[in-house]
């Protein structure tokens, strides 16, 4: 614990001079307006079809795991179709795994041959193909990058995971960090404009010196507008530009990941899976419904956060039809109701059991997700000029009473989300 506290203090001291550039501040504004992104967990682990943690969970050694790339040949990978699918769903950015915890690079890295170009029969740079397509279709691309590495021998001393990989009990930690920074330099100089870096894995060695100021400084020097975030489950470090929450809304801790996290002032994001797995799992049929996912997106917006929704492509490069169909349905809803999500911030009424509110200048959107009564009582909202149902324009009666505002909700409400638009002066 003492070492961990020292790490926090040292990192803060080293990064305390970080001043976001105007480009970075503009990127943060764009990010908060975008609201909805596609998360992609794809790597050599998809060959086994048992999720991205299979190497650790099944205690597979490096020697055995290195046999997998020979079977990874995603000839049906179509980056244009992936990007079109994301845009059809109403998503504004894509975050893809450049390297997950197994250390396998999904681009042609020059730092080792443990990558898709050198080790697989595919021999193509998947990240370059996707980056080029994102630029063509006008959607931002972020890279998820694991700081944790179960393959590299210099990731030493070992952390909490990957202890059965069969690596020698020796290594050079600073050499590993140099390796990681050199890979990041490749990603930030060879793939055009990048939206940001989504770090993960620092929780594996919370007492280590991760040289965060140096790594974050490298990113900002190469691409000042690139946003840095880390899934470390702690309050944000100086040098970070957005804060994420894994499988939880900001301020919640239903999954146990966010117990030491505090909601800060940075842009927020929550990520979630469409079934139970991040990486492709052929046995996982626990698909979330379209209603569940739309309501999670709406709740995220009401909590002033983005929603990053994950797919785990198959080893052949295709995305499961169940995912494609659900994303299309979400996109159809966003096409009709996106006004109440895009470009909004959390509304004046804090999240309630019945739903959430969002807002933008001149308008408050009341998202009624679960409420059967005719009357909905809100805290006092002054200067409300009118209320209508989004889409139909049906008028909604508004009553100002002592200490509150009452809405008389219409019959035949939407089972997913009845959105009431309040036109309000002074907002």
Please describe what each predicted stretch is:
Residues 3-12:
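Sec-dependent N-terminal signal peptides
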Residues 16-427:
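Mature catalytic domains of secreted/periplasmic carbohydrate-active enzymes
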